[in-house]
A protein has these predicted regions:
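Short, small/polar-rich motifs associated with maturation and membrane association
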Residues: 1-385, 389-401, 479-480
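Surface-exposed loop/interface segments of Gram-negative outer-membrane beta-barrel transport/assembly proteins
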Residues: 117, 133, 193-194, 199, ...
């Protein structure tokens, strides 16, 4: 049964994607070679693999900056290519190929995944371990240590650059912002394109994005569900790339599946203790390329009430500012002046022990994050307990139970989109000759917001927003599962599994009087609840060497 209360919002997300990898190319069948007499020519083509077109493959003339990427249909066009140039095509997880250009006008590139690890034993769509070479679908496995290398607070971001065909689209809101996962490109224009997330056999809700304010503007980015998982608790992660790989989970797995296997207790007697602590910092990496020659105004004329930056050239000449003071006309870097370096502190401890045949795992993790936006912070506590034991001496009956509790508190999440309270949007549109630091003293004697534009346009002083437009949210989440497995023989077993995903989120917004959009003040409060229960039954029979070297593998369940 599913119960969900959630408003719908439109969010603009910005991300970056890097590419490398392995592939090979063959001339496109049925297309004749064309010798081009011009010195510079245009080359078109398509990049595919066994499952169809590939989005985002890198195509570049080797040794130059002349390059492009494939579009949603895998097509590319590369200009200014000369005979003798080497066209280099690469993508994560595939063998890069250098193709000599001899005058052909079109090429087809067929990607082949790395086959060096075909003998690996991996976790499949049904949660069972099988030889990778025996699978009939594309998949890729990552170990927990691979995900910890980048020390990303959001688990989704740890996948960036590690899985072929996977794109991470990050929010620009920094720590606590949402991240979208897309496998092999978008499949729908209106629906979700994200893969299904399954943790220890139980699907979890990977909600993404934020909520709109009471006026319909884009509001705070509430993050995404996968960020609730503690990366330190993960044993491995398996990415299943085809819909056929997820038969157990139905149509919602049509965009692929990400299987997460968490750590369990020790197999042998003894106690294992792991302590971790880390700190990461983040700053704005890319800023808009703004002109810094002209000051406030338009058509070369200075206007201290204008929102434009096409006034006179800023050369230090004296002008009358919005306060009526005489000041020299200069331009300022307001983005660096307002935003700060974000920090993320993470510390945790975990225990693994085998107590009289029962393997126990327990962990506690705490993270404290400060955003690049002043007065914005996020605190999270993650507690996990897992126990695995056999019910009989013959070890035919096995029970595995786990519970994971997450408490998250956010204060003043950054506002996004075209909302007048979006600090970045306001600073981006601020006239170049205005210094944002002038507005740190953000209220007058009557308590009204101080701003340069007397017309009371929808913009709001970013410093005032961080102090007097406050949003709070608290989420409490419980992820739990239990399984009972009976194996009467070494080639046949039956498993019953049940799992739950339950969380409540409370949100509030408090706006003080004196602002532009809510001059009399505003207070709102709300909550939402989500829960989903899943139950499954699975019978598995596997036998090697049934006839000579021919084996068999059969599963049945629902």
């Amino acid at each position: 049964m599913l119960k969900r209360f959630r408003p719908v919002s439109l969010i603009l997300l910005v991300g970056a994607l890097g590419f490398s990898g392995n592939l090979y190319a063959t001339p496109m069948s049925g297309i004749p070679r064309v010798d081009i007499s011009q010195q510079n020519a245009k080359v078109s083509g398509i990049v595919e693999d066994a499952l169809g077109p590939v989005t985002g493959a890198s195509v570049i003339v080797k040794g130059t900056t002349n390059g492009t990427m494939t579009d949603l249909d895998g097509h590319f066009t590369l200009d200014n290519v000369k005979k003798g140039d080497i066209i280099q095509i690469s993508f994560i997880g595939y063998t890069s190929q250098d193709i000599p250009y001899t005058g052909q006008s079109e090429i087809t590139v067929k990607l082949v995944e790395d086959t060096q690890k075909l003998d690996e034993v991996v976790v499949t769509a049904l949660g069972m371990k099988r030889d990778k070479k025996a699978l009939g679908y594309a998949m890729q496995e990552l170990k927990g240590d691979d995900l910890l290398a980048s020390r990303e607070p959001n688990l989704a971001n740890s996948l960036s650059g590690k899985v072929s065909g996977l794109q991470i689209v990050r929010s620009s809101n920094g720590v606590g912002g949402s991240s979208k996962i897309v496998l092999r490109g978008n499949n729908s224009l209106t629906g979700s394109n994200q893969p299904l997330i399954v943790v220890d056999g139980t699907p979890m809700d990977n909600f993404t994005g934020g909520v709109d304010d009471v006026w319909g503007n884009s509001g705070a980015d509430m993050g995404n569900g996968l960020s609730d998982i503690n990366p330190e608790d993960i044993e491995s992660m398996t990415v299943l790339k085809g819909a056929s790989a997820a038969a157990l989970y139905g149509s919602r797995a049509g965009n692929g599946v990400i299987l997460i296997t968490t750590k369990s207790g020790r197999k042998n007697e003894g106690l294992g203790i792991t302590i971790n602590a880390g700190i990461t910092a983040e700053t704005i990496f890319l800023k808009p390329d703004l002109q810094n020659d002209f000051g406030q105004g338009s058509v070369g004329v200075y206007d201290n009430q204008s929102r434009l930056s096409w006034g006179p050239k800023a050369m230090g000449q004296m002008v009358t500012d919005w306060r009526g003071n005489q000041i020299p006309l200069h331009t300022y870097d307001n983005i660096d002046a307002f935003f700060r370096t974000g920090t993320s502190f993470n510390e945790g401890v975990s225990f693994q022990q085998n107590i009289k045949g029962t393997a126990v795992f327990a962990s506690v993790n705490r993270s404290d994050d400060a955003s690049i936006t002043p007065r914005s912070k996020l605190n999270k506590t993650n507690i996990t307990l897992r126990a695995t034991t056999f019910l009989d001496e013959a070890e035919k009956w096995k029970v595995d139970a786990k519970v994971n509790y997450i408490n998250q508190n956010a204060h003043n999440r950054p506002i996004q989109g075209v909302n007048p309270s979006n600090a970045f949007n306001t600073i981006y549109n601020l006239p170049r000759s205005l210094n944002i630091r002038e507005f740190e003293d953000d209220v007058d004697e009557q308590g009204n917001m101080i701003w340069y534009d007397a017309s009371k346009n929808p913009q709001e002083n970013p410093y005032w927003v961080t102090r007097y437009r406050q949003n709070e949210d608290t989420r409490n989440r419980l992820l739990g599962n239990i399984s009972l497995k009976y194996a009467p023989t070494d080639w046949f077993d039956i498993e019953l599994r049940g799992g739950t995903d339950y969380y409540t989120t409370t949100k509030s917004e408090k706006v003080y009087a004196g602002g532009n959009t809510s001059p009399r003040g505003l207070y709102t409060e709300g909550s939402e609840t989500f829960y989903e229960n899943n139950f499954s039954f699975l019978a598995t029979a596997r036998k090697d060497n049934l006839i000579d070297r021919l084996g068999g593998f059969v599963t049945f369940g629902g």
